[in-house]
Amino acid sequence: TRKELDGKIIVNMSTIAPSENLAVKAIVEAAGGQFAEAPVSGSVVPATNGTLLILFGGEENVLNPLQKVFGILGKKTFHFGSVGKGSGAKLVLNSLLGIFGEAYSEAMLMARQFGIDTDTIIEAVGGSAMDSPMFQTKKSLWANREFPPAFALKHASKDLNLAVNELKQAGNSLPAVETVAESYRQAVAAGYGEQDVAGVYLKLDRKSVV
């Protein structure tokens, strides 16, 4: 008998744990379909411009018919391997995003505590080896201490927690990821979840004496 999903490809583009995508894959295949994951890297502007990065996990024969759609959404598709690898890659990238957000926020707050002019330290960081596309995108937020969300802190916290949990399930732990995940959990609990990911600065500032 024909199964419900015969001839259909189901693609999950949301950010969930690799283990969750593997569970969905089993359900889809049991119904006769094919499954792949394709979370994206990039926020509002890349999504609008069609310059997202597509982080694909799945079989090559599933990827091929999807390339035209991915070409509209993003500037490049990375094929990481089987289902679970694409979502794992997304957690790697978003863990870096969280760690960078924490590190730059602490650096900006440290400069304030040392009595250093914010605009001057931002220019110095931007001219150093510690510059990055993220810093250039977010530097005005730290300068103004206002954090309208491009990627909300609550979503960064969710992804960091996913990364920590996946590592624990595999019997592993990474200290920076765990520490930053806890910092972001505290920021969400303190009411900063709707701020940009760089808004962890506000939680750190509240705990400091400047």
Regions found by a protein language model. Give the residues of each.
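Short, conserved loop/helix-junction motifs that constitute active-site signature segments
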Residues: 1-6
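Short, proline-enriched alpha-helix->beta-strand connector loops that line the catalytic pocket
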Residues: 7-8, 107
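Rossmann-fold dinucleotide-binding core
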Residues: 9, 14-95
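Helical "substrate-binding/catalytic lid" subdomain
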Residues: 85-204
